[in-house]
C-alpha cells in the first residue's frame, strides 16, 4: 500500500508536523463545516461541459451553448441560485470567451491527476484534482482552478508554492510537459490570478516530502510548530505548545500506511 500525499496534507505538514501527525497518522477526527456547495458544483459541471463538449469546428461557442450547459446542470437549485448562476456564466462568457478570437480545446477537463515519488524507501502517490488543463501557445501547461466563493481569498504564498510543486511533479510525469502557470479563476468576480510555476517549486516539494519521509520512517520528530495557525487549530487541546496542561492524546485508530520502494527518483 502506497502512501497518499496531497496538497492539503503537505500544507498541513508544512504548518505543523504535530498537527499532521495527529490528523493523518494518529487518525484523530476534526469537526468540519461546509456551506451549501450546490451552486458551486453546478457551475463547475456546466463549465466542464462547455469546454469539453464544444466541437471546436467554430472559433467560439455562442452564449446559447452556455445556457444549454447551465440548463443541464442546474436542476435541483433554487430559483435564485439559477438566476445567480446564469449571471455568473454570462460574465464568464463575456470576459473569457467572447473577448477571444478563438478558444482552443483543453488538454483535460475536470479530473484527477496522480504522480509518484520514491524517497527513504517509501513510495508516495501524489494526488490532486483540476478543473481544466490548457496547452499554452508558447509551450507548457496552465492548470486552472475555478473558485465559486463570494470573496477573493488567496491562500498563503507558501501554500500556493506547495500546490504548484505537487502539480508540477504530477503533470510532468503524466504529460511530459512542464507546468507554467497555476491560475485561480474567481467566477463571481471574473478575476483570474496567475502564479508562475518553476522547477524550484518541484525541488521544494521534493525536499519537503523527503523530510516527511524521514519522520514517517522513524516515527519521530513530530514536534509542534507554534504560529498564527494555532488560534484555529482543532488539536490545540492536545498540544504542549498551546495548552499548559494538554489533554492525553486518544489511542490511535489505525496504524500508519507505509510502503517500501526504491531510492529517490
Residue ranges of predicted features:
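Nuclease catalytic cores
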Residues: 10-11, 15-55, 85-86, 90, ...
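Short acidic, Pro/Gly- and aromatic-enriched capping/linker segments at domain boundaries
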Residues: 1-9
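A non-catalytic, helix-rich entry segment at domain boundaries
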Residues: 45-116
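Metal-dependent nuclease catalytic regions and adjoining charged, substrate-binding loops involved
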Residues: 4-5, 138, 170-265
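Mg2+/Mn2+-dependent nuclease catalytic core
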Residues: 111-209
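A residue-level signal for conserved active-site and pocket-lining positions in enzyme catalytic cores
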Residues: 16, 43-44, 132, 167, ...
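Short, compositionally biased low-complexity segments
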Residues: 13-20, 42, 54-70, 177-186
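Short amphipathic alpha-helical segments and their helix-coil junctions
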Residues: 1-2, 18-30, 67-73, 143, ...
Amino acid at each position: 500500500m502506497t502512501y497518499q500525499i496531497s496538497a492539503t496534507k503537505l500544507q498541513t505538514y508544512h504548518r505543523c508536523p504535530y498537527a499532521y501527525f495527529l490528523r493523518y497518522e494518529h487518525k484523530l477526527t476534526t469537526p468540519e463545516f461546509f456551506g451549501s456547495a450546490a451552486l458551486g458544483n453546478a457551475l463547475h459541471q456546466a463549465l466542464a461541459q462547455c469546454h469539453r463538449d464544444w466541437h471546436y469546428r467554430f472559433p467560439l461557442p455562442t452564449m446559447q451553448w452556455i445556457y444549454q450547459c447551465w440548463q443541464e446542470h442546474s436542476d435541483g437549485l433554487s430559483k435564485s441560485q439559477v438566476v445567480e448562476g446564469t449571471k455568473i456564466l454570462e460574465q464568464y462568457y463575456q470576459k473569457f470567451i467572447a473577448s477571444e478570437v478563438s478558444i482552443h480545446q483543453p488538454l483535460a477537463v475536470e479530473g484527477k491527476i496522480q504522480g509518484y515519488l520514491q524517497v527513504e524507501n517509501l513510495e508516495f502517490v501524489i494526488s490532486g484534482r483540476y478543473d481544466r488543463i490548457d496547452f499554452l501557445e508558447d509551450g507548457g501547461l496552465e492548470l486552472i482552478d475555478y473558485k465559486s466563493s463570494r470573496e477573493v481569498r488567496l491562500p498563503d504564498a507558501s501554500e500556493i508554492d506547495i500546490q504548484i510543486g505537487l502539480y508540477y511533479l504530477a503533470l510532468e510525469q503524466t504529460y511530459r510537459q512542464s507546468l507554467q502557470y497555476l491560475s485561480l479563476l474567481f467566477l463571481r468576480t471574473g478575476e483570474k490570478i496567475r502564479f508562475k510555476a518553476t522547477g524550484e517549486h518541484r525541488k521544494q516539494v521534493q525536499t519537503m516530502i523527503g523530510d516527511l519521509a524521514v519522520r514517517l520512517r522513524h516515527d519521530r520528530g513530530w514536534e509542534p510548530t507554534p504560529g498564527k495557525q494555532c488560534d484555529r487549530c482543532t488539536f490545540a487541546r492536545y498540544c504542549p505548545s498551546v495548552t499548559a496542561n494538554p489533554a492525553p492524546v486518544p489511542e490511535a485508530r489505525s496504524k500508519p500506511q507505509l510502503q517500501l520502494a526504491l531510492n529517490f527518483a
